[in-house]
Amino acid sequence: MTFALGQRWISDTESDLGLGTVVAMDARTVTLMFAASEENRVYARNDAPVTRVTFNVGDVIDCQEGWSLKVEEVLEDEGLYTYFGTREDTQETAIVLREIFLSNHIRFNKPQDKLYAGQIDRMDNFVLRYRALQNQFEQHKSPMRGLCGMRAGLIPHQLYIAHEVGRRHAPRVLLADEVGLGKTIEAGMIIHQQVLSGRAERILIVVPETLQHQWLVEMMRRFNLHFSIFDEERCIEAFAEAENPFDTQQYVLCSLDFLRKSRKRFEQALEGEWDLLVVDEAHHLEWSQDKPSREYQVVEGLAERTAGVLLLTATPEQLGRESHFARLRLLDPDRFYDYDAFVEEEEQYAPVADAITSLFSGEKLPDEAKNQITELLSEQDVEPLFRIIESDSDEEAKASARQELIDNLMDRHGTGRVLFRNTRAAIKGFPKRNVHLMPMDIPQQYTTSMRVSGMIGGKMTPEARAVKNLYPEEIFQEFEGEDSSWWQFDSRVNWLLEKVKEKRSDKVLVIASRASTALQLEQALREREGIRATVFHEGMSILERDKAAAYFAQEEGGAQVLICSEIGSEGRNFQFANQLVMFDLPFNPDLLEQRIGRLDRIGQKRDIDIHVPYLKDTSQAILARWFDEGLNAFAETCPTGRAVYDKYSDALIEMLASGDVSNLDEVIEESAKMNKELKSQLEQGRDRLLEMHSNGGEKAQQIVEKISSTDGDTNLVTFALSLFDTIGLNQDDKGENALVVTPSEHMMVPSYPGLPYEGATITFDRDTALSREDMHFISWEHPMIQGGIDLLMSEGVGTSAVSLLKNKALPVGTILLELVYAVDAQAPKRSGITRFLPKTPIRMMMDARGNDLSPQVEFEGFNRQLSPVNRHLGSKLVTSVQKDIHSLIEAGDALVEQKVEEVRKQAHQDMQQSLNAELERLQALKAVNPNIRDEEIESIEEQIKELTGYINQAQVQLDSLRLIVVSHN
């Protein structure tokens, strides 16, 4: 291949990029700029997947300025073409057009050229291509796009929040659901929608160090989003590729600590030009008016430079209104600038909440409530609605009038658009916790080793001593060596063996603080009783943990017991189990809540049993009593636990380190009192209005119904299997709704998108995918389907075919020509064009006279009457009627224009309807709710203008065609 600057080439693999221009070359590579889609590509010079663009005499070509030229002569000079000819619009002759000025939007790879050249595809490939176009079109138009393909149960409040926020331009919100309600999943769904719609291409997730793997796994397992963890080591490696290591990946995950410690890395992250920033555990960002913490400043710096920001926090505002304000200030500093003004404004929402409560109850509205509503909304808006509510209209009309009032009030509610918070109290469907505390005698061996350790302990801080005393088995091993079998005499192990045997039919999750303890417990279960158990700890790779989790999840032949270490269990959920054993206790209430949260989550079908075996007169006994009597943390979620712990931690550490429990009762009593006070403050301050808004009510149910109606789509299964067949993947039925798909030697391409080298087990069933983490959940949004469709399109599979129609009612040799056109607007993905004008297939069925029969001849039914022909015979048939085909394509091209106009018109209508409604709503709200940002309104106005241009320029192209010949035998 010889390249020269200014030459025009087209990509073989990505024909939708438009026409490319050579803009740079060196000895090994060539760079092409595709102006139509605002993309650049760098290829290896010797095997670049591109084709040189040359036109011949008689062709009509478009210039960038919008006029067309009919070519009469072509000259080549130093590798560049110049075209001479007549302008189509002014009829001027001897016009010169150099190839550098050719329109960027020109397309190639005509299916008719393939047909004439005898490159005839199989009939079933033509069918697959048409179905791919059809399905892709429907998926892009679906308002639920981005929500159907995730591996998660359909939980109304999560879907509502994700749907509400995911569609916004550059969303800036605070997700503050209580523990166990699935904030990570909500954030993942929002990210997924933003990625699919093209609104977010570069994403940075900042989390505490211990949660990095959890996020990595959740994003990959649930949403097929592959993030890269960045730490110092990774940045040094990446430096070889780019000056700023953050530029080497689109999806980056790093810890807050990493950015805090290194100013250099923080500054590089600031220059990363992110579209979306996600910060987990945002309640750890300390802020006060005089002195914000370094962590807070790091996040503030990133939030100022990033359009979209999601903050996740589990702490309710009543425990720290100031810190709550600080979080909102990160999202919108112009709006939340003064803490005192914020407090005052918050207090004005009480009447809104009262008004909404009376609307929700469905009772007659008292005058007081009416006056409050009229004050908040303008009179002309509410009067007609009041009339409907009080008239004898049918219940449905009343309900919808009520809902409209509620929606309007919600919109005007101060933080309704910025803050979402669901509480367990407001969401039903949580299991009951049955707590079993079991004090046990301490073995003599432990008493001795702990006494000796105390005597020779040397200088240790009280905190280190307190932690050490919690794990007597480790102290024993310090004296007796790592291999000492403490599990032969530990009374907790004896109890555990009996419990597991007693619960033969139940899955048991055991959590211990240390990985070494977990490994030795597995050995004890195996060697002493032959019980099938598997281990899960931080020393294992993600793949090994997946395998362990899958082994535990298996109904038949799986492990009965899974033993986790503290860190190993983070972020994993085992809702299918309901027996939890805490072999020891963690040091703080947050970790305790996390442990219970492995089973006690939304989606848990049964009540859970929490077993806490502990050794009498040890540190564990102190903690067990404090957690149970001081916080009631085993039986209920404990949002207040951290605040109580912070106050009494010094006293607790002192007791755990010294073993002196003389004032334990007093600490427990005071803790219980403080806990009760904080909880009642929480209950009184519950923002009912916010809860009503956050759980989405009716709307949330409708979203669930829409998505569940697409689950189990047989159309998807049929399509996926044909797709895998065509591309050449091996498929083995595994039973239980599962298939194993592996690459084969005769594949169309060296590697299949989204499929690991060793293959994958897939399922189309959501419930199976939820209980088996080792399976891929296949939906229309999965990379294996999306990538497969892109592959079909780019490889030109099924663009031309020939079929026979056995029908004695028609004369032998009658021909029909099936034409499939695609209307496509070339525009950057982030413009949001696919919502209104995705690639749209238009099918036409031309008879020999040039009439379109497609309205009478439905695709699937007609296709069943056809039979395939081999390539040799097909080629002969094409040659014999080539002239007719040519004139039928011309007739089709003329007829399709009108249909394209209809498609454009519909796209305009959809776009205007959707965006104008949103624009009017925001403009009306801006007058009463300062939470509407100017950028949001400007962005929609800009989007309407941009999209109008793109839709007007949408082009139609013949995508594929099939010649059909009538035969009688």
Swiss-Prot record:
Recorded superkingdom: Bacteria
Listed Pfam families: Helicase_C, RapA_C, SNF2-rel_dom, Tudor_1_RapA, Tudor_RapA
Location of the Helicase ATP-binding domain: 164-334
SUPFAM superfamilies linked to this entry: P-loop containing nucleoside triphosphate hydrolases
Alphabetical keyword list: Activator, ATP-binding, DNA-binding, Helicase, Hydrolase, Nucleotide-binding, Transcription, Transcription regulation
Record motif DEAH box, residues: 280-283
One term of GO molecular function: ATP binding
Gene3D superfamilies documented for this protein: 2.30.30.140, 2.30.30.930, 3.30.360.80, 6.10.140.1500, 6.10.140.2230, P-loop containing nucleotide triphosphate hydrolases (3.40.50.300), Tandem AAA-ATPase domain (3.40.50.10810)
One BP term from GO: regulation of DNA-templated transcription
EC number: 3.6.4.-
Ligand binding (ATP): D177, E178, V179, G180, L181, G182, K183, T184
Membrane-spanning intervals of the chain: none
Domain spans labelled Helicase C-terminal: 492-646
Keyword Electron transport assigned: no
Cited HAMAP family: Helicase_RapA
Role noted for this protein: Transcription regulator that activates transcription by stimulating RNA polymerase (RNAP) recycling in case of stress conditions such as supercoiled DNA or high salt concentrations. Probably acts by releasing the RNAP, when it is trapped or immobilized on tightly supercoiled DNA. Does not activate transcription on linear DNA. Probably not involved in DNA repair.
The protein's assembly and partners: Interacts with the RNAP. Has a higher affinity for the core RNAP than for the holoenzyme. Its ATPase activity is stimulated by binding to RNAP.
Record family assignment: Belongs to the SNF2/RAD54 helicase family. RapA subfamily.
Name the record gives this protein: RNA polymerase-associated protein RapA
Classification of source organism: Bacteria, Pseudomonadati, Pseudomonadota, Gammaproteobacteria, Vibrionales
